[in-house]
């Protein structure tokens, strides 16, 4: 199956798992924004430290602007396979198309590790 248009690079499974772990810890001890509207606002305000997007979002127009916005604001971003898992990691009973990490809480080291790998993903 072809990747959606908003998926600009492949995120290794290990890194996707770390991103989900980061979302979970940040939702419990830090501050996150869930959903495309909230992610867009926190990215435009340059509050987001990292954006995590699901690859199985339909319609794709929901997320198509997020990677461009992140690059403009120099915010690292990664992808995870399933929106249901992203929602669960954010502490929701429903799925989430995207999550912005605003304050990582106890996951600061994990955030820094993921953000450091971002430049190599885009090649």
PLM region spans:
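Short charge-dense sequence patches
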Residues: 13-20, 60-68
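Polybasic, low-complexity intrinsically disordered tails and interdomain linkers
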Residues: 1-47, 105-123
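Short basic, glycine-rich beta-strand/loop surfaces that mediate nucleic-acid
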Residues: 63-64, 68-122
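Residue-level signature of catalytic and energy-coupling elements of molecular machines
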Residues: 35, 51, 70
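Short, functional N-terminal and low-complexity linear motifs
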Residues: 4-10, 54, 77-84
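Extracellular/luminal Protease-associated
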Residues: 43, 47-63, 67, 76-80
């Amino acid at each position: 199956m072809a990747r959606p248009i908003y998926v600009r690079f492949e995120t290794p499974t290990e890194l996707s798992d770390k991103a989900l772990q980061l979302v979970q810890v940040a939702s419990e001890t830090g501050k996150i924004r869930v959903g495309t509207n909230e992610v867009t606002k926190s990215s435009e305000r340059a509050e987001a430290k990292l954006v995590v997007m699901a690859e199985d979002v339909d319609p794709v127009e929901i997320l198509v602007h997020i990677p461009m916005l992140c690059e403009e604001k120099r915010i690292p971003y990664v992808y995870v396979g399933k929106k249901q898992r992203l929602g669960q990691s954010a502490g929701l009973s429903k799925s989430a198309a995207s999550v912005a990490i605003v304050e990582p809480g106890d996951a600061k080291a994990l955030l820094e590790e993921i953000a450091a790998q971002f430049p190599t993903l885009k090649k």
